[in-house]
Amino acid sequence: MIPVSLVVVVVGGWTVVYLTDLVLKSSVYFKHSYEDWLESNGLSISPFHIRWQTAVFNRAFYSWGRRKARMLYQWFNFGMVFGVIAMFSSFFLLGKTLMQTLAQMMADSPSSYSSSSSSSSSSSSSSSSSSSSSSSSSLHNEQVLQVVVPGINLPVNQLTYFFAAVLISGVVHEIGHGIAAIREQVRFNGFGIFLFIIYPGAFVDLFTTHLQLISPVQQLRIFCAGIWHNFVLALLGILALVLLPVILLPFYYTGVGVLITEVAEDSPAIGPRGLFVGDLVTHLQDCPVTNVQDWNECLDTIAYEPQIGYCISASTLQQLSFPVRAYKRLDGSTECCNNHSLTDVCFSYRNNFNKRLHTCLPARKAVEATQVCRTNKDCKKSSSSSFCIIPSLETHTRLIKVKHPPQIDMLYVGHPLHLHYTVSITSFIPRFNFLSIDLPVVVETFVKYLISLSGALAIVNAVPCFALDGQWILNSFLDATLTSVIGDNDVKDLIGFFILLGGSVLLAANVTLGLWMVTAR
C-alpha cells in the first residue's frame, strides 16, 4: 500500500503551495509584484499543477533544427513511417493487452486460488517465516503494457528511478517535436517542464498558425517525432543494458555467481546461517547460478517442479531417525516432526519393499554433503544401501540448499518467491574493495526503467486517442491520404472521429481494468 506519510507530504505540500499562491494573488500589497514575478519567470500555478516555460533554450533548439538539414529530413521521414505504423499497431497491442487482462481476471477468480502457509527457519538449519501463496497462473502473466501505481506495484524505494525516467523520456519526446517543428519552419516559442501531483513532464510551445499552414506530411513529421525519439531512446537503453558488462569490465566482473546487495528485514533468509550483504551465491540446490537470470530461472524451476530429494545411507538414516507419529496436514501433505522445531524436517522415503515411510531428521545433517535425487535408483549409483529422502512439506513450500562459499550452505524452507522478493542481487562483482556493490544495480535499474517508460510513452502516445499525439497523427495521416480520394471533408472527419473514439475506448478500458487488477488484489 501507499505509505500514509507519502500521501500526507504530497497533499500537504500542494495545499501549502496553492494557498500561498492564492493569498499572494489576493493580497493588495503583493498581488502585482507577485504576478509580475510569475510572468517574468514563466511560472503558472493551479491546484496540483505547476508549470514552468522558458525561452532560454530557443537558441539551442534552432541550432539543432537547422544543422545538417538533409540528414534531419531523412531522420524525421523514418520517424513519420514509424509513427504511422505504431499508430495502427497500437490497436492490435491494446486489444491483445485487454484480452490478457480479461483472461487474467478469469484465472484470478476465487475458485482458481489455492493457498498454503509455509514456515521456515534460518537458525541452525534454515530460515523462518510464514505466508501464503496463490496459484501460479498469475505469476507468469507477461504483458507489454501494465498500469503502474506507486506504492502498489511500484516499490516506494524505486520512485526516484521511476520519476527520473519519466522526466527524461518526456524531455526527449518534446525535444523531438521541437527540432522537427523548426526543421519544418514552424515558429518555436519555448520549452517547459510541469509537475502534475507527483508526475513530472515536459512540453514545447509551437506557433499554432504555422502548424496549420504547412502540409499534412510536414505535420506528420512533427507529430511523429516525439514517439520516434522515445523509441530510439528505448533502443539505446537496450544497447546500454546489453553492453553494461563490457562497459563496467575494468571495475566489475561477471559470470561467477550473484552478489547479495540487500536482504529485507522481514526476509526468511535472515539469520545466523542465512544470507548477508556481500555473499556470493553459486548454486540453488544443484542448479548453478552465474548471473541474475540463472537465479530467477533456478527459483522458477524449484517452485514449479516437485521437491527434490537427497541421498542418505541406510546407516546414517538409522542413526539420525527416531520414532515419530505422522499425521496429515490440511493440504494433504504429511507432517511427522514437532511443529515448533527449527532444525528438524519431516522426510519421506521408500524402503526396500517400496513402502513409503516418514521420518523426522535434523535437516542439516540429513542433506549436507549429499547428492540430489528423485528416486532410490539415483542413489544406488554411489551406494547400494542408500535411500532417497524427500522433504515432506506443504504444497508450495520447498527446502532449498543455497551455496554461498566459503560460508556454510544456507538451508531455506519456504516459498521460493519469498526468497526472490526479499533478497536483492547483482551479477556484477567488484574487482576492488573500494568499489560500491550498489553502483551497477543503480545503473542497471535506472536503464531498465528508462527502457520501459520511454517505450511505453511511444506506444501510448501513438494510440489514436483524444488529447494524445495519436489524434494529430491520425488527422494528418487522413488529410495526406484521403483528401484526394474523399472530396467531402465531413466524411473524412467522421471516419477520423470513429477511429479516435475506438482508440479512446480501447485505451480507457485497458487503463480501467488495469487499475482494477492492480488495486483490487
Curated annotation (Swiss-Prot):
Reactions catalysed, as given in the entry: Cleaves several transcription factors that are type-2 transmembrane proteins within membrane-spanning domains. Known substrates include sterol regulatory element-binding protein (SREBP) -1, SREBP-2 and forms of the transcriptional activator ATF6. SREBP-2 is cleaved at the site 477-DRSRILL-|-CVLTFLCLSFNPLTSLLQWGGA-505. The residues Asn-Pro, 11 residues distal to the site of cleavage in the membrane-spanning domain, are important for cleavage by S2P endopeptidase. Replacement of either of these residues does not prevent cleavage, but there is no cleavage if both of these residues are replaced
SUPFAM superfamilies: PDZ domain-like
Statement: the UniProt record of this protein carries the keyword Repeat: no
EC identifiers of the protein: 3.4.24.85
Topology feature Cytoplasmic, residues: 1-3, 516-521
Residues annotated for Zn(2+) binding in this entry: 173, 177
Gene: MBTPS2
Necessary cofactors: Zn(2+)
Origin species: Pongo abelii
InterPro entries: MBTPS2 (IPR001193), PDZ_sf (IPR036034), Peptidase_M50 (IPR008915)
Topology feature Lumenal, residues: 25-74, 108-146, 254-448, 479-494
GO cellular component, one term: cytoplasm
Region annotation Disordered: where it falls in the sequence: 113-137
GO biological process: bone maturation; cholesterol metabolic process; membrane protein intracellular domain proteolysis; regulation of response to endoplasmic reticulum stress
Family indicated by similarity: Belongs to the peptidase M50A family.
Annotated active site: 174
Subcellular location: Membrane; Cytoplasm; Golgi apparatus membrane
Cofactor note: Binds 1 zinc ion per subunit.
Name listed for the protein in its UniProt record: Membrane-bound transcription factor site-2 protease
Keywords recorded for this protein, A-Z: Cholesterol metabolism, Cytoplasm, Glycoprotein, Golgi apparatus, Hydrolase, Lipid metabolism, Membrane, Metal-binding, Metalloprotease, Protease, Steroid metabolism, Sterol metabolism, Transmembrane, Transmembrane helix, Zinc
